[in-house]
Amino acid sequence: VETPPPLPAAYDELSAASSGCPPLPPISGFVGRGDGVLLYDAFAPYRATGTNLYYLQQLLAYAQQDGNPRLAAAVGEVLDDLVCLSLPVARIWGFNDSPDRSSIRKGPDDFQEAGLRGLDQAVWEAKRRGIRLIVPLANNWADYGGLPAYAAWASKRDGVVYTRDDFFSDATMKQWWKDYAALLAERVNTFTGVRYRDEPTILAWEVANELRCQTCRGTTRLTDTVRELAAFLRRVMPNHLIADGGEGFDDQAGLYVGLSNSYPVRGDEGTSFSALAALPELDMVSYHYYPKSYGLESPRDTAVWIQRHQAIATALGKVAYLGECGYIGADSERAASFDAWLGHLFEVEGGQLGLMWQLLPSARASNDAFSVYSRKDRATAWILSRWGRDLR
């Protein structure tokens, strides 16, 4: 990695609006899809890098409930950092099915206005800075409730034990997902005054974050569920791009010749990227990259993983995007890895969008080994900024 030059002096101030950081272009229209290409204003290719900020809704719900300006400032800080780093896309959770006081939903019909207002403000804070959002509507994991919360609601309803994998065969659980999507589509944001279905700040909706189904005995059930939910989402959110939100696991190992480990592509997790990419109901298909977690630590694995996902989607007229990528290690090592990964992504046909995991405000404690503090991790910040500037 090259020696990072100083970032703008204004970068160390809280507000990009009052600093010397050049602003991002204002959001004035929807991002769409051509034949395997993201398009802005119907004709200009859209290329960008960004980050995951999954926690925005929760922090802003807390800030509103407590009248806590420090929490609101922490959100402002990290979003201003995106502006200064020229990162115009963030991926944030659009769900919160936990029992926490920041919850959006505590039961099938128990929606929480306080939680929804947290999401409202997250959209507004991003919009006024020119940051577009990718928003999953559920979670495979128990964090923020997720499919385990759906299973718990169903267990309480029927008096039997359900697991998250039952979501893929239970019509009522899937209807609960649809109920939330429909509610959100028609909701008028209390900060922007715009219905969610009409909000161009939303780049794409994801069906869910990292769906898996180890007990599904094949990948058909998960694929069919994504098809059903994506079709519904397209009806209620007709202006937006629709994506799956998955990790890119597949059941067609022959499409990924050269990987050092077949685990992510032999169907063990019940998902098939290639089948999802073929769904007409989806505009975009996501894949994630965590080399250690996926057992892909050979030097060649990165290129194969990224290039093959992009090629599969492009051949089917879809947009593939790197929805998450994370590295555990020193700042300089992470910077070199991100630089190499983004290099592979943006050099291939169809490579248009890559998001790292995860950027945190300086006051928030890290909850995993992948966290990046842009004001401390200067090598990583510089690499992200360089890519952001180059893609503008």
Name these PLM-found stretches:
Residues N52-Y55, A90-S98, P136-G145, A208-L211, ...:
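Short, solvent-exposed turn/loop segments enriched in Gly/Ser/Thr/Pro and often Arg
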Residues Y62-S155, T219-A243, I306-A313, F338-F346:
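Aromatic-lined substrate-binding rim segments of carbohydrate-active enzymes
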Residues I92-N96, I134-R217:
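Active-site groove signature of glycoside hydrolases
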Residues S102-A114, R128, A138-A171, Q175, ...:
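Aromatic- and acidic-residue-enriched segments that line the glycan-binding/catalytic groove
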